[in-house]
Amino acid sequence: GLESRGLGDVYKRQVYDYPIHQNDILPTVAEAAGAQIPNDRIIDGKNLIPYINNEIKTPPHETLFWISGRLKTVMHNEWKLIKDEKINKNWLFNLSNDPTERNNLAEANPIKVSELELMLFNHMKEQSPPVFQSSLSIPVLIDKHGGQEYVEGDEYLYWDN
């Protein structure tokens, strides 16, 4: 969600509960500032102002994607798939039933994994190649903060910078 702090009386402080993406910042700030968005390229984000002002009642995104090297995520409606291609592992969560992502449903739901993988594949085909390749790939423990040590059996994934 989003917490907006107002711009005078125009946009009062409020909390917005639907998922948004960092790509939404540019179109939203540009609209608030009265600036033009470049039309010579695709801008992935959406202007959130009509959503925040309840002019549009539906969520701004049905599907969101995050890509960091070999770590890829797609969130579609209530489902979220995280793929770590380095260790060939998937995590699938039903966010309606498991908002804190504790119960990996990937093995029990191979059809849903395949559906989301196809969405991710199609999204990746539309993307420009990275300008810079990752220079670092580090293991990150799942559900542990950086000060906690790895214990045999802990789950982890690899994050590419």
Where are these regions (language model features)?
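Long, internal low-complexity/basic segments
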Residues: 25, 77, 88, 100-161
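Short, surface-exposed beta-strand/loop micro-motifs that present aromatic residues
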Residues: 70-83, 91
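Generic preference for hydrophobic
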Residues: 10, 64-65, 81, 92
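Beta-strand elements within well-structured catalytic alpha/beta cores of enzymes
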Residues: 5, 25-30, 93, 98
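Conserved beta-strand positions that form and line the central face of beta-propeller blades
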Residues: 1, 15, 47, 91, ...
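Residue-level detector of conserved, well-ordered beta-strand and adjacent loop positions
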Residues: 66, 75, 93-96, 106
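Polar, surface-exposed loop/tail segments
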Residues: 13-74, 133-135
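Single conserved hydrophobic/aromatic residue that forms the stacking wall/gate
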Residues: 1-11
